Amino acid sequence: MATLTEDDVLEQLEAQDNLFSFMKTAHSILLHGIRQFLPSLFVDNDEEIVEYAVKPLLAQSGPLDDIDVALRLIYALGKMDKWLYADITHFSQFWHYLNEQDETPGFADDITWDFISNVNSITCNATLYDALKAMKFADFAVWSEARFSGMVKTALTLAVTTTLKELTP
């Protein structure tokens, strides 16, 4: 499995022009990051254990191919901070929510604001989050949907890259 570089991640996310495709790509990138991280949980395994136990667990049809199951295992083993677990879970849940919608909201919609307001890697970055809040609740004459949407996309991109950096084994 090829490792994604930060440039690859930025390029893939920047290429997305709507929230649905962005979140689909982000979900895919985060799942890839988790798959890269999982083998580090199984340390000092001999060849037989790796072949008959670890590989089937990590296979695409294996139980750890589900992002939620893999996250729970990583968190339960104490290999992930609570904020990181919450952020990835939140991304996964929002992606599943968007996947079920007939009409996908945009970057500037209230449901998206509610989502990013609960992503720790965004809210803990005071400069970024304060700028987003100022833009979101600015006077109508100052507010620009295109500019705000761009800021939201940037914030979400930073959240994904921050999360991936934390998943380094």
Regions found by a protein language model. Give the residues of each.
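Amphipathic alpha-helical interface elements
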Residues: 1-169
